[in-house]
C-alpha cells in the first residue's frame, strides 16, 4: 500500500512538472497571437497608413507596437507568420523617419543649417518576396504586424 502511494505521488509530481513547463511556452500570448523568444506577434490583413497601424498596435496590448526585428531568425519567424495570414505582400514594421531626424550633411562637408523639407515622412515596410526593407511615404496603406513583449 505504501509503494502504491509513493508511485502515485511520484507520477503526480512528474505530471505537474510537465504541465507547468508546457504552460509557460505559448500561454504567455493571448489567443490568436504567436510566441517567439518572449514576444507575441500578430499579423493584420487590413491596410492602414504607418501612424494608424502603430496606433492600432498600441491599442491591442500594453507595450504593443509595430514589429521590430533584432535578428534574422526573428525576421524569418515573422515572415512565415505573415505569409500564413496574407501571403507574399508588403507590411509595415516599426521603423520610420517620422520626425525627419536623419543626420544629413552636404557633400562638401558643411553642416546642414538651412532646411526646406517637404512634409512627407518616410516609414519602412518589409517586402516578403525578397525579405528586404524599403521605405515609402508613411501615408500609404499597407498590412502590418504588431508585437509586444510577453
Swiss-Prot record:
It is found in: Secreted. Its main location: secreted. Pfam families: Lectin_C. Keywords: Disulfide bond, Hemostasis impairing toxin, Metal-binding, Secreted, Signal, Toxin. Expressed by the venom gland. Residues 1-27 form the signal peptide. Residues 36-147 form the C-type lectin domain. Transmembrane segments: none annotated. InterPro entries: C-type_lectin-like (IPR001304), C-type_lectin-like/link_sf (IPR016186), C-type_lectin/snaclec_domain (IPR050111), C-type_lectin_CS (IPR018378), CTDL_fold (IPR016187). One of its GO terms (cellular component) is extracellular region. One of its GO terms (molecular function) is metal ion binding. Disulfide bonds join 29-40, 57-146, 123-138. It comes from the Eukaryota. Gene3D superfamilies: Mannose-Binding Protein A, subunit A (3.10.100.10). Belongs to the snaclec family. PANTHER family: MANNOSE, PHOSPHOLIPASE, LECTIN RECEPTOR RELATED. Heteromultimer; disulfide-linked. Interferes with one step of hemostasis (modulation of platelet aggregation, or coagulation cascade, for example). This is C-type lectin 16.
